């Protein structure tokens, strides 16, 4: 039997980054990532052909598999305007750990994405006022978030 040092369940962004971080600490680790989704080349959604969700098994072909739903998204990450103090996209993290620490973590993750070939051009940041308006509307209409930060 081939022994592993670490087994990670789930190949979404958290699982992938966990493996990456562990290998930065010790590049001799034997890591296995277990993912219930199909290989990326076999992931497709039949909704456009048949007009409705068929509840793919064992899980949704869009959300399950390597890179999670991000494999088929617009690859939106939590980023911020370098000329502003405001973190424009990314939820409540700045409220929890502060703007500067959030920016440090975003920069760290962005650097890794760029290292692996991500496009360095940031789309949409020129629409700062529109982004802030959408963000504020989302906050106002979020009846499900009962957390107080």
Region annotations inferred by a language model:
Residues 1-14, 32-34:
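Beta1/beta-strand and adjacent pyrophosphate-binding region of the FAD-binding site
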Residues 2-4, 16, 78, 112:
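Broad hydrophobic/π-residue packing in well-ordered secondary structure
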Residues 3-4, 27-30, 66-67:
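Short coil/turn connectors at secondary-structure junctions
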Residues 19, 23-24:
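Gly/Ala-rich phosphate-binding loop of Rossmann-like dinucleotide-binding domains
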Residues 28-35, 40:
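Short beta-strand "acidic-cap" motif of Rossmann-like dinucleotide-binding folds
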Residues 39-43, 47-149:
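Conserved N-terminal/central alpha/beta ligand/cofactor-binding core
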């Amino acid at each position: 039997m081939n022994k592993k040092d670490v087994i990670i369940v789930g190949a979404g962004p958290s699982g992938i980054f966990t493996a990456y971080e562990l290998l930065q600490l010790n590049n001799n680790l034997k890591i296995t990532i277990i993912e219930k989704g199909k290989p990326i080349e076999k992931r497709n959604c039949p909704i456009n052909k048949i007009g409705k969700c068929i509840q793919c098994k064992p899980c949704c072909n869009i959300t399950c598999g390597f890179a999670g739903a991000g494999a088929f998204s617009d690859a939106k990450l939590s980023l911020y305007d370098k000329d502003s103090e405001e973190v424009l996209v990314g939820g409540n993290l700045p409220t929890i750990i502060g703007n500067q620490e959030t920016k440090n973590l975003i920069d760290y993750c962005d650097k890794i994405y760029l290292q692996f070939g991500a496009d360095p051009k940031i789309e949409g940041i020129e629409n700062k006022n529109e982004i802030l308006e959408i963000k504020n509307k989302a906050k106002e209409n979020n009846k499900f978030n009962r957390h107080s930060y």
